[in-house]
């Protein structure tokens, strides 16, 4: 072990924030309690790399050896740079590394490289005999499953770090590899303290996703199937229109469905004269099919050639090498960068002011990784803007909303678990409404459906009129043949009639909640919830909505 690594007198260039020290102390407490495999959760931009570098710095002088695992080159370099700020000189294990420098006390390994070495006796012996602490960056991804399945970490101290400890579908459950979770502060707290910036979310509509296929392994939308729904002129025009209206000249990162979709999006923005590029993995030239192959294979080959030629032409005009494109994006004022999922993690560019989700996802992990790219504090940046073209915020919640994380993913009994949202100044029937305060026109940002005062612009919703909503309305209930069977006011309806009327009129859940609350408050609402077998989450959302409204 080098004296440089051992020296406790070397002052690091980084001082931990209070909440980061709290996370470190909670982690130490859990380890003392006997839990050796811990998942540490902290929002994107909260300083996970700083925390685990601090832990490594404190462990090395005690004779401990630390192995840090990551899955991307950017993360490798980022971790290496932060460790250097803590006066640690790590040994890098990446492509081409054939030997281990046993003199070192800290190692950073590309997971893909270690995977290729893991079956070799000398590498196994090194992990078993020398490594004391294993730190895993972006621990939620499945790339690291093999190291747990190997059994080499069974008796090691393992600390997994991620902003999104969540898996779904048929993925290996995190609870198989981690015993407990250490939770850091939520996004809302970090925003309030000035460590992250606030997000202004605009719901830009979404194409129908009813016919989009879902990947059974990831439980998320299939890329090519989704692209067919998003490859439409009105959506390309919508991105340009919203950018020009709300954030002209600001630096924007756009996420698309697939490479062709990313290229077409870049072309549309380039037509308007904006500085725009796309970045993607290099697309290889298709191989010619064998002689005598089926007509289907020939047709598929022709389609692949067409896509390759489109990519090649666009690559020369609107892209380039990954490093050069990212350098251009960093240095160019008002630059717009289009990608698919290449920049969801390990990409740190604080100057990003706008995130555009030109796609949909069912994955909370992917959703937060994408929008988290805009959350970092930078110079005079007070907030970042999210343009949501995939209904993601309605499906998964806003950036600041509290998230429930767990090591085991279980199917929910009902509801999405996401509080209902609304556009500021817009009614449930998508019509503008005049504010009752000084601000007469809403800002159209997404806000909680339960609030009557917009926290962004100060728009105040007019007070509802209970008499107008209930006493003066008559509801007509018809049987299966369309024959009228009852006409009565809402407050006199029984539960079956009220539920049936709502279904006939296709009213929202919020409409039903209001009727129940006005005629009997929380007690009436909970009684109906019991009658209709609502889940606990749905009941709580309904109560929260009504408490904020009335």
Q: What spans do the regions from the language model cover?
A:
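Conserved interdomain linker/interface between the two RecA-like ATPase lobes of SF2 helicase motors
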Residues: 180-256
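Post-DEXD/H (motif II) to motif III coupling segment of the RecA-like Helicase ATP-binding lobe
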Residues: 141-201
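Conserved helicase/translocase motor-coupling segment
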Residues: 223-292, 315, 319-328
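Conserved Walker A/P-loop ATP-binding site and its immediately adjacent core
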Residues: 50-51, 60-85, 259-260
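Conserved helicase ATPase core of P-loop NTP-dependent helicases/translocases
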Residues: 77, 93-100, 264, 275-340
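Conserved pre-motif I regulatory segment
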Residues: 4-41
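Conserved RecA-like P-loop NTPase helicase motor core
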Residues: 284, 314-403, 408, 412
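Walker A/P-loop
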Residues: 34-55
